Amino acid sequence: MTEKVTKFQSPVPIVLKLRDLIFGKEKPDLFTKINFLLNLVLWAIFMIWSLFSFYTLEARNFIYRQKGIPVETIIKNRGRELGFEGEDFLQRLLTVNGISIICWGVVFLSLVLMYRRSKRFYYLFLVPIVFYIGLLFIYVSPSYFFEDTTTFDKLALIIMLTSASIYYYLIKNKEKDEEINFFGIETDEDGA
């Protein structure tokens, strides 16, 4: 005979309760789901890349011993090309990647608020992304931002900021019980 699995023996109820705790029990509309999923995928790419970059920089000696890849030499050479001296470029990359992990963690919290259709998501979303871009541009260097940051990264950041701004605009107007009108022109349907 098979034993019946109780809720205390199965991990599924715990996972479902955790999901409900994080995302809430109410399902959002289709536009919110699409916007959330788009930003979640882009968030995951940036978070994974930041984690890998940080690990690679921290484990550069281990990588050299195991694989013979001179990560530190490669980074120092690129730093010299960008005008940095000695360990400065490496330390700045470590700092940027460490802080970017924190920034992307805050962005995930904002995505949870987006899924719950809270207007507060926008500020938690906007501040760390703008801070991240500022770190790359100001703390490392403008030439690093333009030459070493990929076009994909730049486009992904623009897509994230644009989609979040549009979504914020739409939920702000929805809370005011106004019709969504991007151009601000009243039409016959709007009561003109």
Regions found by a protein language model. Give the residues of each.
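Topology signature of small-to-medium multi-pass alpha-helical membrane proteins
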Residues: T2-A192
